Amino acid sequence: MLARGLALRSVLVKGCQPFLSAPRECPGHPRVGTGEGACISTKTPRPFSEIPSPGDNGWINLYRFWKEKGTQKIHYHHVQNFQKYGPIYREKLGNLESVYIIDPEDVALLFKFEGPNPERYNIPPWVAYHQHYQKPVGVLLKKSGAWKKDRLVLNTEVMAPEAIKNFIPLLDTVSQDFVGVLHRRIKQQGSGKFSGDIREDLFRFAFESITNVIFGERLGMLEEIVDPEAQKFIDAVYQMFHTSVPMLNLPPDLFRLFRTKTWRDHVAAWDTIFNKAEKYTQNFYWDLRRKREFNNYPGILYRLLGNDKLLSEDVKANVTEMLAGGVDTTSMTLQWHLYEMARSLNVQEMLREEVLNARRQAQGDTSKMLQLVPLLKASIKETLRLHPISVTLQRYLVNDLVLRDYMIPAKTLVQVAVYAMGRDPAFFSNPGQFDPTRWLGKERDLIHFRNLGFGWGVRQCVGRRIAELEMTLFLIHILENFKVELQHFSDVDTIFNLILMPDKPIFLVFRPFNQDPLQA
């Protein structure tokens, strides 16, 4: 059955009209219209088997993939395949077969027909752990109606504009305290500046931020002495990501049956995540229950448990997922942003000028200030273009769909190669350049279905608004207080560790920035 039960020609005509754009030359593959995959064709669609592919034997493909050490370089693997096969190809690795696309117009058509309850690829070891140990799942792993029920409730509490306003003071104080952390480091080094790798500090900042929003209270992760139990949660999240990678292309049950170290470490990581999240949830909730009046927003947990729209087990599962998803992801993006600002000092000065002007105009109103920093917000989009957290976005087709004259059957996994798209000159001019202005002004006409750092549609990242606000406030305070430079001018590569991250520590220099009081 074709998308939404329409006739093939009807689907192609109606599906392509809103998305058409001028033809564009794509390096490494034949000249095509940017919207050609979504366009009407008078030809009969070609069969799925004719989509360019390295071969149908998934195990041979997987052997070659491992032999080329593709596991940590899967984003480069995608880039090479698009250069070799063109803007659409299919690949089977082990038992998993996917169709990969890169053109924004094809992406637009994919999402147009994703259906009311989109289904994405679930990480196999995560599913195996939750099923084997009978752990409750939230929106991360739920499907269909169960997913939609949870998601609609969460949208009200974590995505709606009114909810976001409640988070501003909670996240702003954490960002202010991070400035204090850097000033302590400067004082400790005694050289008038701080030089070093702040990756661990960013992990703690991100965890302090997400816990403050969820529980309405601080954990003290930015104090000089950090609670070792809280640090265990941060370490467990990293281990959970790291141990997932070897089990992506082989059945996790094999690792479980043979009790491999990878599986044992993965289980230990998830156990820590669940145990700590349960402890935090219980402790903070009962503290809140004892209070009768609140001077400040009491946090997402209290709101979810208080509105009785979700069972307590569903609330706990979703809180656990938000805690686990709010550490490495945000901290990695901030680390990359600081790196790009340090490499592009002219951009950094443009951002600083905007922030300082916004502070003056807002006159102490943080909410108003957040509306006055479009370039800063664009710089976050630009960071996610160059350094997306996820290497792909995924959707299982609800119905048959025609892309680039190929018939793709229902239930096929289609993956949008986000990293490869962001680096392709066919879709971004000067793709290697950190240029936030490309997302503003006249350039906005060229960003159709290119801003995919948080996903798209009803199944986009549930923590998107929290993360965007958290990063914007963080960068505001950094730009107001420090000039950021690289300690060593060397390129930092990217590796795949379930999320994309730097392949080595990034050493930065923070110099105090003192605004001229006459200009303040």
Curated annotation (Swiss-Prot):
A cytochrome P450 monooxygenase that catalyzes the side-chain hydroxylation and cleavage of cholesterol to pregnenolone, the precursor of most steroid hormones. Catalyzes three sequential oxidation reactions of cholesterol, namely the hydroxylation at C22 followed with the hydroxylation at C20 to yield 20R,22R-hydroxycholesterol that is further cleaved between C20 and C22 to yield the C21-steroid pregnenolone and 4-methylpentanal. Mechanistically, uses molecular oxygen inserting one oxygen atom into a substrate and reducing the second into a water molecule. It catalyses: 6 reduced [adrenodoxin] + cholesterol + 3 O2 + 6 H(+) = 4-methylpentanal + pregnenolone + 6 oxidized [adrenodoxin] + 4 H2O; 2 reduced [adrenodoxin] + cholesterol + O2 + 2 H(+) = (22R)-hydroxycholesterol + 2 oxidized [adrenodoxin] + H2O; (22R)-hydroxycholesterol + 2 reduced [adrenodoxin] + O2 + 2 H(+) = (20R,22R)-20,22-dihydroxycholesterol + 2 oxidized [adrenodoxin] + H2O; (20R,22R)-20,22-dihydroxycholesterol + 2 reduced [adrenodoxin] + O2 + 2 H(+) = 4-methylpentanal + pregnenolone + 2 oxidized [adrenodoxin] + 2 H2O. SUPFAM superfamilies: Cytochrome P450. This is Cholesterol side-chain cleavage enzyme, mitochondrial. It is found in: Mitochondrion inner membrane. GO terms for cellular component: mitochondrial inner membrane. Residues 1-39 form a transit peptide. Its cofactor is heme. Heme binds at C461. One of its GO terms (molecular function) is heme binding. Interacts with FDX1/adrenodoxin. It comes from the Eukaryota. It is a peripheral membrane protein. Its EC number is 1.14.15.6. Its main location: mitochondrion. Belongs to the cytochrome P450 family. PANTHER family: CHOLESTEROL SIDE-CHAIN CLEAVAGE ENZYME, MITOCHONDRIAL, CYTOCHROME P450. Transmembrane segments: none annotated.
